[in-house]
Regions:
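Conserved GTP-binding G-domain of TRAFAC-class P-loop NTPases and closely related GTPase folds
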Residues: 3, 8, 16, 84-149, ...
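Conserved phosphate-donor/acceptor-positioning beta-strand/loop module used by diverse small-molecule
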Residues: 70-90
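A short, structured active-site edge motif that brings together acidic residues
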Residues: 5, 77-83, 229-246
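Substrate-recognition element of Asp-dependent hydrolases with the DxDx(T/V) motif
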Residues: 185-222, 234-241
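Conserved substrate/cofactor phosphate-moiety recognition/catalytic segment
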Residues: 5-61
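Asp-based, Mg2+/Mn2+-dependent phosphohydrolase catalytic module
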Residues: 143-151, 219, 223-231, 246-273, ...
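Conserved nucleotide-binding/hydrolysis micro-motifs of P-loop NTPases
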Residues: 31, 80-86, 206-208
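Active-site neighborhood of HAD-like aspartate-dependent phosphohydrolases
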Residues: 145-198
Length: 299
C-alpha cells in the first residue's frame, strides 16, 4: 500500500515498483469506482500495489481487513513529503501537460484539495496491521537544466513606499513613491542586470479581489513604478483575496515564480528574492532561492 499526499510521486514510484515485482496496480483514478470496488479485485494469487493517497486509518483499514481475510501480508510504503513541495510538483505536472500553470488548479488538483489532504493525513503505524512500513522521502523538484538567473522583486514595501497609504498599497499612479532614492535603486538594479541577472516583479494585489482597485489600476501603478525607476522589467501579480488561499499564485505560493522559471528558463538556486514580508522569505525558501530584504539589497 502506497501512502502519501497527492502529487508526492506515488504513481511514478508505483509504476517502477510494479515492473520490479510483477505486481498489478490498483488505482481508483484509473480504474474508477469506490474503495470497496477495488477491494473486490484483490485475490490471494497475485501481488498488488494499492496506489491511492490512503491518507487516513479509516481508508487503509478496508484493505488491511481484506489482507487479513485472505491471510496475506500487507506492507506500507509511505512517500514522505510536505504540501508545499507537492504543490510545486503539481504545478510542474500542469505545465508539462498544458504548457501553462492554471492558478486555480483547473485541469489538475486545486490548492484546496491539497490543504484538505494535509488535514486528513494520519501517519501509518504497525498497529494498523502492516507487517512493515517503509518510508521514502519524496524527490524534491529541481531546475538544474535551467541556467539563467533572476532577481525576483516584491513591489509594495520593496520598490515602493507604502506604509503611509491607507490600504498599504497605491490605488492610483499618483500615489506611487519609490522606497529609496531613485539613483541608489537604479544603480543597484543595473548592477545585477550587468552581472547577468534578469529582473522580474512578483506581487500580491488582493485589492483587486476586494474591489478596491481594478486590474487596470494595478497595471498603471506598476508602469509608474518602472517609469520612476527608469528600468523596464516584467511584473506578475496575484489578484485573489488574501484569505482563504485558494490559488497557486498568491505568495508564498510558488505559481508566479514557476511561471517565470519555465518561461525564461531560470534556475532558482542561482536567483535572489528581494522582499519585506514573511511570505517573500517563505517563497524563497520553498524554491531554494537566496532571500534579501530591501535594506540589505539596496545598500
Amino acid at each position: 500500500m502506497l501512502i502519501g499526499y497527492p502529487a508526492s510521486g506515488k504513481s511514478t514510484y508505483s509504476s517502477e515498483l510494479a515492473k520490479e515485482t510483477n505486481s498489478i496496480i490498483l488505482n481508483r483514478d484509473t480504474i474508477g469506482g469506490t474503495l470497496k470496488d477495488l477491494v473486490k479485485l484483490i485475490n490471494k494469487d497475485k501481488n498488488y500495489i494499492l496506489d491511492n493517497t490512503n491518507l487516513s486509518i479509516k481508508t487503509r483499514k478496508i484493505f488491511i481487513d481484506k489482507a487479513n481475510e485472505l491471510n496475506i501480508e500487507i506492507n506500507a510504503i509511505y512517500i514522505k513529503s510536505n504540501i508545499e513541495d507537492c504543490m510545486i510538483r503539481c504545478m510542474n505536472r500542469m505545465y508539462q501537460k498544458h504548457s501553462k500553470i492554471y492558478f486555480d488548479g483547473e485541469n489538475d488538483l486545486s490548492p484546496v484539495v491539497l490543504f484538505k489532504s494535509r488535514k486528513e493525513f494520519e501517519e501509518p503505524s504497525l498497529d494498523e496491521g502492516f507487517k512493515e512500513i517503509k518510508i521514502i522521502n519524496a524527490h524534491k523538484l529541481e531546475f538544474n537544466n535551467f541556467n539563467n538567473k533572476c532577481v525576483f522583486l516584491d513591489i509594495d514595501g520593496t520598490l515602493r513606499k507604502t506604509d503611509h497609504l491607507i490600504n498599504k498599497y497605491p490605488i492610483k499612479k499618483e500615489e506611487v513613491e519609490l522606497l529609496f532614492d531613485k539613483d541608489k535603486m537604479k544603480t543597484t538594479l543595473n548592477k545585477y542586470v550587468n552581472d547577468g541577472y534578469m529582473l522580474y516583479g512578483v506581487s500580491n494585489q488582493s485589492g483587486i479581489g476586494k474591489n478596491i482597485l481594478s486590474v487596470d489600476d494595478v497595471i498603471d501603478c506598476m508602469n509608474e513604478t518602472k517609469r520612476l525607476l527608469d528600468i523596464e522589467f516584467p511584473i506578475s501579480f496575484c489578484s485573489h483575496n488574501s484569505f482563504p488561499i485558494k490559488c497557486y499564485c498568491r505568495k508564498p505560493q510558488s505559481g508566479l515564480f514557476l511561471e517565470a522559471i519555465y518561461k525564461y528558463e531560470i534556475n532558482p538556486f542561482l536567483s535572489i528574492m528581494v522582499g519585506d514580508r514573511t511570505e517573500d522569505k517563505t517563497s524563497a525558501k520553498r524554491l531554494n532561492m537566496k532571500y534579501m530584504t530591501p535594506n540589505d539589497f539596496f545598500i
